[in-house]
Amino acid sequence: MEIFNETTLPNILRGLYAAPIICELSKLGIFTKASRKINLKNKEKIKNKFVLNISLNYLSHIGLLSKNKDQYVLTDIGYEIFRRSNSFFVPHSYRETILNLGNLLKGQKKISSCNVDRHENILGSGLTHLRYFFQPINYINSKLEYNSVIDLGCGNGHFINEVLKKKNNLKIVGIDLSEDSVKTCKKNIGNNIKKNNYKIFKADISKVKFWKSKISNFVKNSQPLISLWFMLHEISDHKVKNIKKFLQKTHSSFPNSYLVIGEIIKLDDKILKEIYKKSLMPEYLFFHKISGQGILSWKDYKSLLIDSPYSLEYEWLFDNVNSLKTPSAFVWILKPKKKYDKNKY
């Protein structure tokens, strides 16, 4: 059992200041992965040098920067922090909710009125998700036959771009409920694929019949691979049956298509207490829960494979180093079954 000591309070309080400063300096490119020194070109774009200097000075006080000939440089710890600064973006994108917590508790503001920084959220999600992409992409390219990709919840297009690096003669469909994501995705993939070979648009991915009607001619006579990266919790409404219905509709519409699914898991209290010092899962689950997103337990996700129109072909588990061996996230390759009982849905 841990005890309160002289470092407990500063360690908890420090995140209130350090996280926003790291986030904003990273987005402005003050520090990059290429060097420990300040990027002078990007520094010149900063209008308020007073605030910049105070921020840099603060980071030196907490050990992330040191001074070398009157120039700030990243320390070893600082370099590793800024190298992973994309990990700050998604939690930080929900900052309006945290800053309004008092008003929320007093009933003076509704959660739905707290805006998410969509640009930062899209940027952070895309960069954070990269670590989940590599093994599945290698697998699908070596084991599966496909000549088109339907990316449901395409975000900023990072997955699409990673697929195109390995296989560039594809037809691409990207669908997202966020107009910002649609615009960002188009911009990010535009240099890697001919314009007439992709179709990116706004839609609710749970409305399978609708988005299928928009792409039927485009993917006609092709073999689509369907991907869903961290989207099941967006459509579950906390119910397994909603995802099962979605999978059935998807299979009915694309009976020969494999699915690539990545998802985050709702860990129980015991695991969160066990791993909180080395994991951001308490924070991730907090903002997912408070924003009403339906993350399910590992047991619930595994139940999707029972009486399913898909069978599990391959599985990757992430961060399952805890006493219960429960992962914080997983990626599945799901193979479509040729025959299944629709009446079970």
Residue ranges and their predicted role:
Residues 262-308, 315:
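C-terminal alpha-helical "lid/dimerization" subdomain adjacent to the S-adenosyl-L-methionine
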Residues 234-249:
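A short, conserved alpha-helix within the catalytic core of class I
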